[in-house]
């Protein structure tokens, strides 16, 4: 029963942290990027020139026939039941992923798949939330899913962030405020027609839903001095690059061949009692290798062995978090080794640059900065805000505004 509760807790937290999920152990390195901007959340403009590129690997050279299926979702990510597919999709659903290539000269053989939205078979007609399912056509099993957003930017949203918060000044927190102008959208009942979300570094486990506005008028809303828009500053993400299997690269202490696979060891993660600035990517990742040619099919898979020096926590678990963490939740849980006094985890990852952090997930399923990592007001964080709108008589929620700011 205790193990079941632990798995459920991890599942709830880690699934909320990643918009992208893989459900097959053979599917790896799922990534969704808008306009080659691998540092930002997956948000596209409606009827603009934006494109969403989705890639993943299947660990074999046996080509599978995969199809992708799109679903429009409400503001809370439940499927939209009150509109028809023809309302939001121009073209066809359930299309085959036609672009794939086999890996070249890699120890771990894999097939790399790629698709782009929009394309000549489908185009989106409504703003809002979308979920894309990748399905094995032979078994009809869903092997992965990707969540992304489409915004129409019909409302004006302005954001600000400060370290002078309502609970401390230049302490361990940061606070967000924002203002919303309705533009030409008709709003007669704010509680029924407007939904808002604010989050830190694109992490859904930091979502702040429907904060109460500090002021309301016929032109818009203001959200200032709201305590639920106070966030832990946390610490800068850690990082490493595995660019070459013949020698260590940035952040890697050593790399070796064990007779069956490559084993890479990032430097031991020591406690961070004071803040030290280090430019990071807030959990993002980028696939490449030292040759930097055909990275998607020439980069190999290596086992990355994480080691964290921290006092043992007697409640909850320690997990590794990043936008690349799309597999089963237990994959990213660290185990405490009594002999070495370290938390450890080994994860199979593709060569490239990785940004990550350690989180403490308490027994109530809430994630916190790990105590040994610290939480500092100086930490560079990105904040995102989304505003959803439902007009009078409309049957679904539209994403009418999206904004992102960086607090340095």
Identify the residue ranges that each predicted region occupies.
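Contiguous beta-strand segments within globular domains
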Residues: 25-72, 169-180, 293-306
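Ligand-binding face of N-terminal immunoglobulin V-set domains in extracellular IgSF glycoproteins
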Residues: 107-137
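Bacterial Sec-dependent N-terminal signal peptides
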Residues: 1-20
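Aromatic-rich carbohydrate-binding modules that target alpha-glucans
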Residues: 88-113, 204-211, 305-351, 363-391
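Short, compositionally biased P/S/T/A/G/V-rich stretches that sit at domain boundaries
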Residues: 18-47, 153-167, 279-293
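Basic K/R-rich, polyanion-interacting modules in nucleoproteins and related proteins
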Residues: 264-314, 399-408
């Amino acid at each position: 029963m205790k193990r079941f509760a632990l798995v459920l807790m991890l599942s709830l937290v880690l699934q909320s942290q990643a918009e992208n999920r893989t459900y097959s152990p053979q599917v790896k390195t799922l990534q969704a990027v808008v306009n080659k901007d691998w540092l930002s959340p997956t948000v596209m403009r409606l009827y603009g020139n934006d494109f969403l590129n989705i890639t993943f690997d299947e660990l074999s050279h046996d080509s599978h026939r995969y199809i992708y299926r799109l679903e429009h979702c409400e503001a809370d990510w439940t499927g939209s039941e009150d509109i028809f597919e023809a309302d939001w999709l121009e073209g066809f659903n359930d299309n085959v992923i036609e672009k794939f290539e086999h890996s070249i000269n890699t120890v771990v053989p894999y097939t790399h798949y790629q698709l782009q939205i929009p394309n000549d078979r489908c185009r989106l007609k409504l703003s809002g939330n979308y979920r894309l399912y990748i399905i094995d056509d032979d078994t009809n099993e869903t092997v992965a899913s990707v969540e992304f957003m489409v915004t129409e930017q019909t409302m004006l949203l302005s954001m600000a962030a400060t370290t002078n918060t309502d609970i401390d000044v230049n302490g361990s927190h940061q606070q967000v405020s924002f203002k919303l102008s309705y533009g030409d959208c008709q709003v007669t009942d704010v509680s029924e027609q407007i939904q808002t979300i604010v989050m830190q570094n694109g992490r859904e486990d930091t979502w702040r839903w429907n904060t109460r506005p500090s002021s309301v008028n016929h032109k818009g809303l203001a959200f200032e001095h709201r305590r639920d828009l106070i966030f832990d500053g946390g610490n800068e993400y850690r990082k490493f690059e595995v660019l070459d299997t013949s020698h260590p690269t940035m952040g890697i202490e050593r790399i070796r061949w064990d007779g069956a696979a490559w084993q890479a060891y990032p430097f031991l993660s020591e406690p961070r009692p004071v803040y030290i600035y280090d430019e990071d990517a807030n959990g993002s990742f980028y696939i490449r290798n030292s040759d930097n040619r055909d990275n998607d099919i020439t980069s190999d898979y290596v086992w990355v062995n994480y080691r964290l020096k921290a006092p043992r926590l007697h409640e909850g678990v320690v997990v590794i978090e990043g936008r690349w963490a799309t597999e089963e939740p237990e994959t990213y849980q660290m185990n405490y080794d009594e002999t070495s006094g370290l938390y450890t985890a080994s994860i199979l990852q593709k060569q490239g640059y990785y940004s990550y952090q350690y989180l403490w997930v308490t027994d109530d399923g809430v994630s916190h900065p790990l105590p040994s990592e610290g939480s500092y007001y100086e930490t560079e964080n990105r904040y995102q805000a989304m505003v959803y709108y439902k007009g009078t008589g409309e049957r679904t929620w539209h994403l009418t505004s999206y904004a992102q700011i960086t607090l340095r």
